[in-house]
Amino acid sequence: MAKLAEEMNPEGSRYQLLLSCPSGLSPSQVSVDFSKSHDRIPRQDPGLEDSISQVWEQRSQGNSSLFNGQKFRYGGYCLDDDDGSTNEVPHVCLRLGLTDYRTFVGTNLSSLWEKFLVTSEDDSVRCRHTSSPLGNGAVIETSDKKIIVLRRSNNVGEFPGHYVFPGGHPEPTAVGIDYHQLENNVQTGEVLNKKVTQEMFDSIICEVVEETGIPASSLSSPLFIGISRRELNVRPAMFFYLKCSHHSDDIQRLYSSAEDGFESTQLHTVSLDELKMMTSRMPGCHHGGFALYELMLQRLKNTKETSLIAT
């Protein structure tokens, strides 16, 4: 089955790792620069820009579940490592703007998506004309070391029927953002940036609870492990690692009461080897999430080996 899916859509599972944080970063090691300067820049092509509303109208006709809403736009990142050390735990600043689902459908998900790209080695420049809303995903380990994977329903907008990690999007409205405020007040801007940073971590907990039924009290604090981008549609997503105190046998019972269970048809708790076999049936951004998890595991292994040698 996995091989067949890959043959049907080989592009769909390809990915690029934009940022890897294998040590796992806590909220104190992540910050956000939320600014209009990180918003999408319109393409200097009136016909292409007009296609955004046309694609949206076509997609929304007869689809009552499709609605527009604000999203955070991924505009790149910077690493704050001013001391020049080789510390593996840097401080990451995410550059975020504002976009909406309508523009996402009309740029990234459009059949014309490649025409919105610019030839550049700089990812933020290459994708400056795309909506690029920042998605999120959670690699969750149960108490018996199984990983939770969902199979998407056929009613979702992207990759129906594929395997994914629980996740969704951090939401601007969760921190009271409907539009860009005047940024004359530096103090107000700093407060807002802190709220947006916290939303990056709070939102993944909310998504996990809503999609799996696992209570928040059973989850560890999320650790940010990086950002991947699906090559098809240049779709970015940030990934987190969480531990769950429940045994895998308990997860199915919890899933039956999940608030957003309609977004998926099945929940699987799988071993690492089983998960590897499923990656060709994952969207590229989630395949990249698995790669980020592998890098985290490799670092843990290397750290343990180094510790043993030292003793």
UniProtKB/Swiss-Prot annotation:
CC cofactor: Mg(2+); Mn(2+)
SUPFAM superfamilies assigned: Nudix
Record's keyword terms, sorted: Hydrolase, Magnesium, Manganese, Metal-binding
Molecular functions (GO terms): GDP-mannose hydrolase activity; metal ion binding
EC number: 3.6.1.-
GO cellular component: cytosol
Expression sites (tissue/organ): Expressed in roots, stems and leaves.
Alphabetical GO biological process terms: cellular response to ammonium ion
Motif (Nudix box): 192-213
Ranges for domain Nudix hydrolase: 131-298
Residue numbers binding Mg(2+): E207, E211
Similarity field: Belongs to the Nudix hydrolase family.
Function of the molecule: Probably mediates the hydrolysis of some nucleoside diphosphate derivatives.
Name this polypeptide is given: Nudix hydrolase 9
Name of the gene: NUDT9
